[in-house]
Design a protein with these regions (language model features):
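N-terminal mature ectodomain segment of secretory-pathway/periplasmic proteins
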Residues: 43, 48-123
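N-terminal secretory signal peptides that target proteins for export/translocation
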Residues: 1-10
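N-terminal export leaders
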Residues: 12-17
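Gly/Pro-enriched, hydrophobic low-complexity segments
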Residues: 126-129, 142-145, 149, 167-262
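Boundary at the C-terminal end of the N-terminal hydrophobic targeting segment
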Residues: 29-36
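Solvent-exposed coil/turn segments that connect beta secondary-structure elements
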Residues: 72, 90-92, 100-102, 115, ...
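A short, amphipathic edge element
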Residues: 49-50, 79, 147-158, 207-212
Length: 269
């Protein structure tokens, strides 16, 4: 079996496992506690999973792509830092994040395979293992750039519907599938009409709100309307904000051999 077919097979199995979990979880919970509030109908969780998958495909293409991202970090409304990154992504499992500005950090790269993440630095002989939750810059965690697969990393349930900025929105609670993902829990607002992502709140394992995100300025990129501006606001320190601008995005054929430590070592030379 070719590497591409193998990856496709793994992704298909993962989706089926998630769908099965979404269908079976309410009945399992009810069986554990006969006195508990009756579980949601199975279709509710299946619907939630479908909504998150559609929102994922709006944020980023399902196929291989390249995007250029500018990150401005602000404190009390004043910009104190700006960085730029090039992100190369193949499906939901393989990503390279290259630092392009400032010049002093050029040559640094993050490599994600599945949920395994390494950083490569010209001054260090061996790659260093990182967590998706570690801070990359400002309010941006490594996983915010390297991992965009909410449908694969979280178990979603619908917890309500409300109006947000004049739009009818579905409100979802996303629970991490394990501790290896970027956030323990996410509260997610998705437009009911077209599944556009609107807002997210990201929580720590303790339940503490870490930061909020707003998806803004939808424009035609890589074949469909996508949010080109993401505003991340620190919930613990008022006025600390990071603004991500997706300057370009295009579909690009990216062979799997690119997403290896050996390939990135060659880029450093």
């Amino acid at each position: 079996m070719s590497p591409a077919m193998s990856l496709e097979h793994r992704l298909r199995r993962r989706f089926l496992a998630l769908l099965a979990s979404a269908l079976l979880l309410p009945n399992w919970a009810q069986a554990q506690d006969a006195d508990a509030t009756p579980a949601q109908e199975p279709t509710a969780d299946a619907e939630a999973l479908e909504i998150v998958m559609r929102a994922d495909e709006i944020r980023f293409p399902r196929d291989s792509f390249q995007t250029e991202i500018a990150v401005r970090n602000l404190s009390a409304g004043e910009q104190n830092d700006e960085r730029k990154f090039r992100v190369l992504s193949r499906g939901n499992e393989n990503t390279i994040v290259l630092s392009t500005e400032p010049a002093s950090e050029r040559g640094q790269a993050l490599l994600m395979r599945g949920r395994d993440l390494w950083i490569f630095m010209p001054s260090v002989s061996q790659p260093v293992r990182l967590s998706l939750a570690q801070r990359l810059t400002g309010q941006v965690a490594n996983g915010d750039l390297a991992r965009a697969n909410l449908a694969g990393d979280y178990i979603p349930t619908i917890i309500g519907r409300e109006e947000l900025d004049g739009q009818a929105a579905v409100v979802l609670s996303l629970s991490a599938v394990d501790r290896g993902v970027t956030y323990s829990k996410v509260k997610y607002w998705v437009a009911e009409k077209d599944s556009r992502p609107l807002k997210a709140e990201f929580y720590a394992l303790s339940g503490r709100l870490l930061k909020t995100a707003r998806y803004e300025e939808f424009k035609d990129m890589a074949g469909r309307l996508r949010p080109t501006r993401l505003v991340l606001e620190d919930a613990l320190r008022a006025g600390e904000v990071s603004v991500l601008t997706y300057e370009t995005m295009r579909l690009r054929d990216l062979p799997e051999r690119m997403f290896t430590r050996e390939y990135l070592r060659r880029l450093e030379q």
